[in-house]
Each structure stands twice: as structure tokens, then as C-alpha cells.
């Protein structure tokens, strides 16, 4: 039995977000194929995701130096508890399903803030004399990525720092990232929206059966 963490990184409701619609198709098929697995849904835009800021970094250094957690300011304790809870939730999962849009050739800022909660030396990777070593080698992920243009291939593929960035950072910590599902090109061809979404949903069903 596997524990799946379904991470949604779009503020848009499902009826508006095409990638979220495709992700729901993926999850429905996955649950049908794996009824004994547990699925936990994390909607980032409905979640407190603390920024890795000076306050958190200072608290981390103070704790490493021996300061007691209870000696931190109450608001810092609260922020650190929220941060650590996201870390532990991520580490406890076996599989990850990320659904996220491409914004200005990158990922949503809240998704980047979330990434900072689990890419942590000593938890998801460690430094060695030979360089960084991944620690999450027994886990896997799939990325469901929406964009108005076409960036998965072709002349604009080198422009994007969305799907390639998230894929790279997950691989850096050892996670096996299977082929992504792209929901793309609708802004280029609005008349083909239904066709594009249907094709992506078909890929999602096939991918879910193998995930």
C-alpha cells in the first residue's frame, strides 16, 4: 500500500483550470486501480506555506547552536511548526502528483515556497565529500503541467523553467519522475480546447494505470 500526496499549485477552481481537470481524471483512474492506497490532497493556495525568510533562517541557526525551541518568539514557533509539518508530510509520502501552471515561463511562487520546505540538507539530500547525495530514492512523482503556449517541445522549449525545473529539483533529491502530462497550447488554438483537454485526459488515464 502506497501513500500518495496530491499537490495542487493553482489558485484557480477546477472548472477554470484545465490542468486541474486533467489531474482529477488522473486521480480518479489511479484510485480505481489502487483502491488500497491512501491519497492526501494538499491545495497550496489554501495552505499556510511559510516563506524561507530571514526569520526562519535565523531560527534555524539558533536551534542548531543549541537554543531551545520554546525560547523562540511565539510567532516564530508557529511559522516553524507550519514549515516543519509540510516537510514531514512530504517525506512521509511514497508517490507525488503535482499539478501546476506555467506562469511567466516559471512556476507559481507558492510552489517555489513549498519546494523550499522539502529540499533540505539532511532530510531529502545530504552533502558528502563527493558532492550532494539524494535521500529519497525509493519514491516517484508525476507532473501535470498546464500552459497556454506549447513549451514541451519545439523552438520555445528552451524558454520554459516550469516543468524542467520541478523535474530537476525532484530528481536532485532522488525521486523518480515519470513522463509528464502536458495540457498546453489552448491559448494558441482556443477552438481546440476540448480536443486538447480530451487528449490530455486520455494520457492521464494511461499514466495513472502505470503509476
UniProtKB/Swiss-Prot annotation:
Reaction(s) catalysed (UniProt annotation): 2 a quinone + NADH + H(+) = 2 a 1,4-benzosemiquinone + NAD(+); N,N-dimethyl-1,4-phenylenediamine + anthranilate + 2 NAD(+) = 2-(4-dimethylaminophenyl)diazenylbenzoate + 2 NADH + 2 H(+)
Co-factor requirement: FMN
UniProt keyword annotation of Lyase present: no
Sample GO molecular function, one term: FMN binding
Top-rank lineage group of the source organism: Bacteria
Keyword annotations from UniProtKB, A to Z: Flavoprotein, FMN, NAD, Oxidoreductase
InterPro entries linked to this entry: Flavodoxin_fold, Flavoprotein-like_sf, FMN-dep_NADH:Q_OxRdtase_AzoR1, NADH:quinone_OxRdtase_FMN_depd
Coiled coil: none
Residues given in the record as FMN binding sites: 10, 17-19
Keyword Transport recorded: no
Gene3D superfamilies: 3.40.50.360
EC number: 1.6.5.-, 1.7.1.17
Cofactor details (free text): Binds 1 FMN per subunit.
SUPFAM superfamilies the record matches: Flavoproteins
Subunit structure: Homodimer.
Protein family: Belongs to the azoreductase type 1 family.
Function noted in UniProt: Quinone reductase that provides resistance to thiol-specific stress caused by electrophilic quinones. Also exhibits azoreductase activity. Catalyzes the reductive cleavage of the azo bond in aromatic azo compounds to the corresponding amines.
The protein's name: FMN-dependent NADH:quinone oxidoreductase 2
Organism: Listeria monocytogenes serotype 4b (strain F2365)
Amino acid at each position: 500500500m502506497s501513500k500518495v500526496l496530491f499537490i495542487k499549485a493553482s489558485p484557480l477552481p477546477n472548472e477554470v483550470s484545465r490542468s486541474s481537470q486533467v489531474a482529477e481524471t488522473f486521480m480518479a483512474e489511479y484510485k480505481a486501480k489502487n483502491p488500497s492506497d491512501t491519497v492526501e490532497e494538499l491545495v497550496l493556495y489554501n495552505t499556510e506555506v511559510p516563506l524561507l525568510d530571514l526569520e526562519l533562517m535565523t531560527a534555524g541557526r539558533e536551534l542548531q547552536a543549541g537554543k531551545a525551541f520554546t525560547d523562540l518568539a511565539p510567532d516564530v514557533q508557529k511559522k516553524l511548526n507550519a514549515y516543519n509539518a509540510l516537510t514531514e508530510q512530504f517525506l512521509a509520502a511514497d508517490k507525488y502528483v503535482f499539478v501546476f501552471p506555467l506562469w511567466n515561463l516559471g512556476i507559481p511562487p507558492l510552489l517555489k515556497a513549498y519546494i523550499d520546505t522539502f529540499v533540505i540538507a539532511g532530510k531529502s539530500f545530504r552533502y558528502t565529500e563527493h558532492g550532494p547525495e539524494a535521500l529519497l530514492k525509493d519514491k516517484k512523482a508525476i507532473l501535470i503541467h498546464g500552459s497556454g503556449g506549447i513549451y514541451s517541445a519545439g523552438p520555445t522549449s528552451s524558454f520554459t523553467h516550469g516543468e524542467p525545473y520541478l523535474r530537476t529539483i525532484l530528481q536532485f533529491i532522488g525521486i523518480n519522475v515519470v513522463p509528464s502530462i502536458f495540457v498546453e497550447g489552448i491559448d494558441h488554438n482556443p477552438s481546440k480546447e476540448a480536443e486538447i483537454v480530451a487528449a490530455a485526459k486520455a494520457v492521464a488515464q494511461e499514466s495513472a494505470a502505470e503509476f
